């Protein structure tokens, strides 16, 4: 048996663009992808902190160190430029693997620069 666990998270990223006329996906700064352990074309869940929308899409790599967080295609209707979002990816693990696993959690500032990289988060704490 396997269970689904949080693998990677980019916390409170700022949407820099919403491009309705582009083929679907989310464009993420390659540096943020690398640090958060999110791969190109990986399925991600997006949570918009400002409006509560939750949806899934896949990742394409943006220019490294550009700070780009751009929702493309239909997903562009779910956010607005300037919204704060949480980007999460998941993995399937056995119970034994899950008990030893820690997710990668990346905190960014208002310009999507890396503030902190951790392997855990606790309720009630902003690390």
From Swiss-Prot:
SUPFAM superfamilies: ADC-like. GO terms for cellular component: cytosol. GO terms for biological process: alanine biosynthetic process; pantothenate biosynthetic process. The active site is at residues 25, 58. Keywords: Autocatalytic cleavage, Cytoplasm, Decarboxylase, Lyase, Pantothenate biosynthesis, Pyruvate, Schiff base, Zymogen. It holds the Pfam family Asp_decarbox. Is synthesized initially as an inactive proenzyme, which is activated by self-cleavage at a specific serine bond to produce a beta-subunit with a hydroxyl group at its C-terminus and an alpha-subunit with a pyruvoyl group at its N-terminus. Substrate binds at residues 57, 73-75. Its cofactor is pyruvate. Catalyzes the pyruvoyl-dependent decarboxylation of aspartate to produce beta-alanine. This is Aspartate 1-decarboxylase. It comes from Clostridium botulinum (strain Loch Maree / Type A3). The gene is panD.
């Amino acid at each position: 048996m396997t269970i689904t666990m949080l693998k990677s998270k980019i916390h409170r990223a700022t949407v820099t663009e919403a491009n309705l006329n582009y083929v679907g996906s989310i464009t993420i700064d390659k540096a943020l992808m690398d640090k958060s352990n999110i791969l190109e074309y990986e399925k991600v869940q997006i949570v918009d902190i400002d409006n509560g929308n939750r949806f899934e899409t896949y990742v394409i790599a943006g220019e490294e160190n550009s700070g780009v967080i751009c929702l493309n295609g239909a997903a562009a209707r779910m956010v607005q430029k300037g919204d704060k979002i949480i980007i999460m990816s998941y993995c399937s693990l056995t119970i034994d693997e899950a008990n030893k696993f820690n997710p990668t959690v990346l905190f960014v500032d208002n310009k999507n620069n890396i503030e902190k990289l951790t392997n855990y988060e606790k309720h009630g704490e902003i690390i």
